Swiss-Prot record:
It is a multi-pass membrane protein. This is Adhesion G protein-coupled receptor E3. Keywords: Calcium, Cell membrane, Disulfide bond, EGF-like domain, G-protein coupled receptor, Glycoprotein, Membrane, Receptor, Repeat, Secreted, Signal, Transducer, Transmembrane, Transmembrane helix. GO terms for cellular component: extracellular region; ficolin-1-rich granule membrane; membrane; plasma membrane; secretory granule membrane. SMART domains: EGF, EGF_CA, GPS. Residues 379-389, 438-464, 530-557, 602-652 are cytoplasmic. It comes from Homo sapiens (Human). Residues 621-652 are annotated as: Disordered. Displays a predominantly leukocyte-restricted expression, with highest levels in neutrophils, monocytes and macrophages. Proteolytically cleaved into 2 subunits, an extracellular alpha subunit and a seven-transmembrane subunit. Residues 22-357, 411-416, 486-508, 579-580 are extracellular. Belongs to the G-protein coupled receptor 2 family. Adhesion G-protein coupled receptor (ADGR) subfamily. Has no murine ortholog. PANTHER family: ADHESION G PROTEIN-COUPLED RECEPTOR E3 (PTHR12011:SF455), ADHESION G-PROTEIN COUPLED RECEPTOR (PTHR12011).
Length: 652
């Protein structure tokens, strides 16, 4: 009973908020905390704060003003060398790292222009900086040696780049561990920038996470992953950025390079390494934030990649890295390992086939109509109500809701929260539809197997007991686990569907492949059982017409049970375009086959349709008779030539 009350209640709340908003248009005496009144009509958040809705001027009474963290992307205030940014409520400040202080003696400053941080430690620190300076100068000469890179082949270039990356990491970590008392070291030139941080004791509550910044790129890593449980000696983390290396190991080294896409590298190449233990597993993924080399729209394809070394050379790979957030200036990635990283972007993505789009929308529209008619038939036709029609009804409802949401919501990528909800709902509805297809296959097999013993009652009891918990419960558990584990992978930049990152698509494809494989096996078993049964009957029973009808219904069951979805996995190679058309045409008409087989070709349903048709005609005839009688009046008598509906004029 709560469902009918929900919509009026929601409308009431919206109207209440609208009335409150209208009243506040003439006065903003009650702006939220950290906000000020503008022209006595609107509120605006104070400097250092932003509204929850993103609007500069607002009147909504429940709006909030949240603190802006200027030290993180997309703001990322740059404090200069040997300094870090600290966020405070409504503001921020820069401060020299330990071992450095301002020339003026002040504790804080506002930006890199005010940075006069000077070294105050012993000569060992100077030696450490000198060592780092030698490293960056040495490798700068290698990176800028155009003759070296032009004379080498593709495989030699990747191998040389891999060697350089490993050597820089090793030498930088070695330098940082020589003098761990110098907590932070920063150095850079035109080609390489380095920051190292050393840990000499256990992780504290204040330093659970370390943040390193070089050339507007940053990395967040857990302290426990740096020390790896080793409390006997110092540990260090190094973060290195290469300004020009991306021109050498560019997007042509991407292992998933598609000739149809113009992919380019849109960030500096960065490396991350920890020591003294090198090849270690991380308890939690590191977060990397890249500043774009070119400001680009956030709707482009974005790939978080790392430099993967193999026996045949090295290349950019997405394994273990996935996208968290992207805007015009920055990209944020999560990676489950340490290596060298970058951001690749697709300048132009593959255009959609307009013919396939038309086929999809027309086919799904026809399916929606057929599924609606089928669902109404199963609901209203009392003569055919049983376990079988209950299965048909649930399958029809799930497919109807899934197709309807697909048509109206698949492209609604903004706001992102709504897009994620749509993606999650589509995930659940299509999984539920496939689960009901599996139950259809199981019921069909059990019915065929028990033809000889006529044990329908036990089948019905079994299906009634398991079908609803399985049909709706199993998909709910699958989606709940997926959403709890990877909520950010619901919704992409151009579709409200599942991300391809981290193999997340297999949370849908895995169950689907298992279901249509099981249904294909069940279909073959049913076909074999029916063939044996029919061959044992009197030859007169199996007429040519009945055989043809049986063959047609059996073929249609392939579509209804979802076995044709395997065509979606065959869209590779030269036949990809043909398979795409077959997959789209066949599966967009699944609803039509359900209505055709379970309704139009069912004798019981045909009789019910005929009964309904006669009742409609009779009702219409009686209505016309009543209307005509009303026009003639109670005292009127029909003339000899008048013939009422349903009467035949007799000749004597």
């Amino acid at each position: 009973m709560q469902g009918p009350l929900l919509l009026p209640g929601l409308c009431f709340l919206l109207s209440l908020f609208g009335a409150v908003t209208q009243k506040t248009k003439t006065s903003c005496a009650k702006c939220p905390p950290n906000a000020s009144c503008v022209n006595n009509t609107h509120c605006t958040c104070n400097h250092g704060y932003t509204s929850g809705s993103g609007q500069k001027l607002f009147t909504f009474p429940l709006e909030t003003c949240n603190d802006i963290n200027e030290c993180t992307p997309p703001y990322s205030v740059y404090c200069g060398f040997n300094a870090v940014c600290y966020n405070v409520e409504g503001s921020f400040y820069c401060q020299c790292v330990p071992g450095y202080r301002l020339h003026s003696g002040n504790e804080q400053f506002s930006n890199s222009n005010e940075n006069t941080c000077q070294d105050t430690t012993s000569s060992k620190t100077t030696e450490g900086r000198k060592e780092l300076q030698k490293i960056v100068d040495k490798f700068e000469s290698l990176l800028t040696n155009q003759t070296l890179w032009r004379t080498e082949g593709r495989q030699e270039i990747s191998s040389t780049a891999t060697t350089i990356l490993r050597d820089v990491e090793s030498k930088v970590l070695e330098t940082a561990l020589k003098d761990p008392e110098q907590k932070v070291l920063k150095i850079q030139n035109d080609s390489v920038a380095i920051e190292t941080q050393a840990i000499t004791d256990n992780c504290s509550e204040e330093r659970k996470t370390f943040n390193l910044n070089v050339q507007m790129n940053s990395m967040d890593i857990r302290c426990s992953d740096i020390i790896q449980g080793d409390t006997q000696g110092p540990s260090a983390i190094a973060f290195i950025s290469y300004s020009s290396l991306g021109n050498i190991i560019n997007a042509t080294f991407f292992e998933e390079m598609d000739k149809k896409d113009q992919v380019y590298l849109n960030s500096q190449v960065v490396s991350a390494a920890i020591g003294p233990k090198r090849n270690v597993s991380l308890s939690k993924s590191v977060t990397l934030t890249f500043q774009h080399v070119k400001m680009t729209p956030s709707t482009k394809k974005v790939f978080c990649v790392y430099w993967k070394s193999t026996g045949q050379g090295s290349q950019w790979s997405r394994d273990g890295c996935f996208l968290i957030h992207v805007n015009k200036s920055h990209t944020m990635c999560n990676c489950s390992h340490l290596s060298s990283f970058a951001v690749l972007m697709a300048l132009t993505s593959q255009e959609e086939d307009p013919v396939l789009t038309v086929i999809t929308y027309v086919g799904l529209s026809v399916s929606l109509l057929c599924l609606l008619l089928a669902a109404l038939t199963f609901l209203l036709c009392k003569a055919i109500r049983n376990t079988s029609t209950s299965l048909h009804l649930q399958l029809s409802l799930c497919l109807f809701l899934a197709h309807l949401l697909f048509l109206v919501g698949i492209d609604r990528t903004e706001p992102k929260v709504l897009c994620s909800i749509i993606a999650g709902a589509l995930h659940y509805l299509y999984l539920a539809a496939f689960t009901w297809m599996l139950l259809e296959g199981v019921h069909l097999f059990l019915t065929a197997r028990n033809l000889t013993v006529v044990n329908y009652s036990s089948i019905n009891r079994l299906m009634k007991w398991i079908m609803f918990p399985v049909g709706y419960g199993v998909p709910a558990v699958t989606v709940a686990i997926s959403a709890a584990s990877w909520p950010h992978l619901y919704g992409t930049a151009d579709r409200c569907w599942l991300h391809l990152d981290q193999g997340f698509m297999w949370s849908f494809l895995g169950p689907v492949c298992a279901i249509f494989s099981a249904n294909l096996v069940l279909f073959i078993l049913v076909f074999w059982i029916l063939k044996r049964k029919l061959s044992s009957l009197n030859s007169e029973v199996s007429t040519i017409q009945n055989t043809r009808m049986l063959a047609f219904k059996a073929t249609a069951q392939l579509f209804i049970l979802g076995c044709t979805w395997c065509l979606g996995l065959l869209q590779v190679g030269p036949a990809a375009q043909v398979m795409a058309y077959l997959f789209t045409i066949i599966n967009s008409l699944q609803g039509f086959f359900i209505f055709l087989v379970y309704c139009l070709l069912s004798q019981q349903v045909q009789k019910q349709y005929q009964k309904w048709f006669r009742e409609i005609v009779k009702s219409k005839s009686e209505s016309e008779t009543y209307t005509l009688s009303s026009k003639m009046g109670p005292d009127s008598k029909p003339s000899e030539g008048d013939v009422f509906p349903g009467q035949v004029k007799r000749k004597y």
